[in-house]
A protein has these predicted regions:
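Core alpha/beta structural scaffold of self-assembling particle/tube/pore-forming proteins
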Residues: 3-32, 45, 72-80, 85-341
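N-terminal low-complexity, intrinsically disordered segments
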Residues: 41-72
Length: 341
């Protein structure tokens, strides 16, 4: 399959500028660059998933066979417009020998913000927000979720709604499974830089304007979960109930046996990955008794590669998700273990 990085190399000059920014900043949102990309002509398309295949039986001679057809479920996948205006005051650009670099740096920053926005939207959505695509947990199949907390394993309404703690996702990537969708036969593109007047408040907070160099980063974006077996989720991960090899092994059993070898990644954030690492104790053969130590930084679990991302939250309660979307700016990454200087 093609990833966003593959596609950007084939598109026009505006996309190549995005590619330059992605190469320096995209690792903060690796799911956006690692997941497959499907480009479509418009901004939506219909997909048909198989809800059940007929059980073909045997019959004696001269007896009729039951007429059964495959059961299908239809749904529409939509792309939504992502729009990142870029503007730098001409006075700043022309007064500095590094003015051109300032414009390039702002372009990279806006690109990083766009990728972080797509990444956050991949995993979360506010229920009332109709201007963005449904997130992965809304689209994934029923009965593809387990809890890391043994007290929340029973299939009840309360346990289904409980999103406290963090999550890790097992994903199968591909056009028939989990992939991003980009509309209008384009991904993200930068419009040519131009000089124009833009509105800006004066120092006295009155209406005014400045001359600025402007551009736009724009595209039509969505995500599709085309198979009920494309994604499995392990939720309610906390320090008391960390991610373990055993939990991932259990989550693998949610997939049909023929598909378990197709799982592309276990997607998790750094704190969840650290918790997994701490559960893996090793005992060196020192000859001085059993002295255990923490295992090395894991790159796989149950023979599935780990994709570490910053976009998955440590607490996925509604309050925490709302707080993440309430911010106008993505702050520099900060571990939840860190102390302020």
């Amino acid at each position: 399959y093609m990833t966003l990085l593959d596609v950007l190399q084939q598109e026009g000059p505006g996309s190549l500028k995005v590619l330059d920014a992605v190469r320096s900043l995209g690792l903060s949102s690796p799911e956006v660059t690692a997941f497959p990309v499907t480009k479509i002509d418009g901004t939506s398309y219909e997909i048909t998933t198989v809800a059940g295949v007929p059980r073909i039986g045997y019959r004696p001679p001269n007896a009729g066979a039951k007429n059964l057809n495959t059961r299908h479920t239809n749904k529409t996948v939509k792309c939504y417009y992502i729009d990142g205006p870029i503007e730098v005051d001409k006075a700043i650009v022309t007064s500095s020998k590094n003015g051109a670099k300032l414009l390039a740096k702002e372009t990279k920053n806006v690109t990083a913000g766009a990728f972080a926005s797509v990444a956050l939207q991949t995993w979360y959505r506010l229920k009332e927000d109709e201007d963005v695509f449904p997130c992965v947990s809304e689209q994934m199949g029923d009965y593809m979720t387990i809890s890391a907390d043994p007290s929340k394993r029973e299939d009840t309404e309360a346990n289904r709604a409980d999103n406290s703690g963090a999550s890790a996702y097992l994903v199968i990537l591909g056009d028939d499974f989990l992939h991003y969708v980009w509309g209008k036969q384009m991904t993200l593109s930068l419009s040519p830089v131009k000089e124009e007047r833009v509105s800006r408040k004066t120092k006295n907070e009155e209406e005014g304007s400045i001359t600025a160099y402007t551009s736009r980063l724009e595209g039509w974006n969505g995500i599709a979960v085309e198979s009920p077996y494309a994604v499995a989720r392990i939720k309610n991960i906390t320090p008391e109930h960390p991610l373990t090899d055993e939990l991932v092994a259990e989550a693998k059993t949610l997939f049909p046996s023929a598909m378990r070898g197709m799982i592309s990644y276990v997607v998790m954030n750094g704190i969840v990955k650290l918790g997994l690492q701490k559960t893996r104790r090793i005992t060196p053969g020192t000859g001085n008794g059993a002295t255990s130590m923490i295992a090395t930084d894991p790159d796989s679990v149950q023979n599935i590669k780990i994709l570490e991302v910053d976009s998955l939250l440590n607490d996925e309660s509604e309050e925490s998700v709302r707080a993440a979307f309430a911010e106008d700016y993505f702050k520099a990454y900060r571990s939840s273990l860190a102390l302020k200087n």
